[in-house]
Amino acid sequence: AGRHSGACVKHYDTTAEHINASVDASLSEMGIDEIDVLLVHRPDPLMDHHVTGAALDALVDAGKVRAVGASNFRPWDWNLLQSAMRHPLVTNQIELSLKHIAPFTNGDLAFHQQHGHLVMAWSPLGGGDLMTAASELTHRLDSIATRCGVDRAAVATAFLLAHPAKITPVLGTNNLDRISHISSAEMVELDRQHWFYLYEAALGSEVP
């Protein structure tokens, strides 16, 4: 909810009217009575958090939405919206992969880990770059993949799963073979040395 691409200028819309219309349309299109988790897609610079929060609470109260979360929210965006809601925000879907490592140190993961929120990682394979690029990072992914008998996608996913924030990768593929390969990430146990071996390559230098 919150993203509006059907107008002349692409924009965000977190008004109660747009959120309610989006939810009703989704329920109708999917033929269901309740949405498991509704995500506010991105921070809206024009969001009135009292209006948005009240609308989201009302959807939960009405049984149309089981839980509410966010996508691409920074901690301060999260706190602003949560301050105007009775129901808890339960998850934040953020960009996170070996190609986008900022959340490991910019406070995003620490914030959600502190409060016990579910973190979902979108683009966990770096938009496919980790599967096609040739670099020191992919070389290291391949070396671990060979040792573990999996492919580099599984290792890149295992890197996220090893974090104590209990990250849930969100896969952007319907390819059953790809999903099967990625599911083998659970077979990959990265110790601290191997985790930092990959992190170092993603960072481009040794850690300080």
Give the positions of each predicted feature:
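Short, small-residue-rich loop/turn micro-motifs
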Residues: 1, 34, 123
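Structural motif corresponding to the early beta-alpha repeats
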Residues: 1-13, 41
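Short, functionally important structural connectors and interaction interfaces within domains
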Residues: 6, 11, 22-27, 81, ...
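Intrinsic-disorder/low-complexity, polar/charged segments
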Residues: 8, 15-17, 175
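Short, acidic/polar
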Residues: 12-30, 76-79, 104-107
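Active-site groove signature of glycoside hydrolases
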Residues: 27-46
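Beta/alpha (TIM)-barrel catalytic core signal, keyed to glycine-rich beta->alpha loops juxtaposed to Asp/Glu
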Residues: 43-207
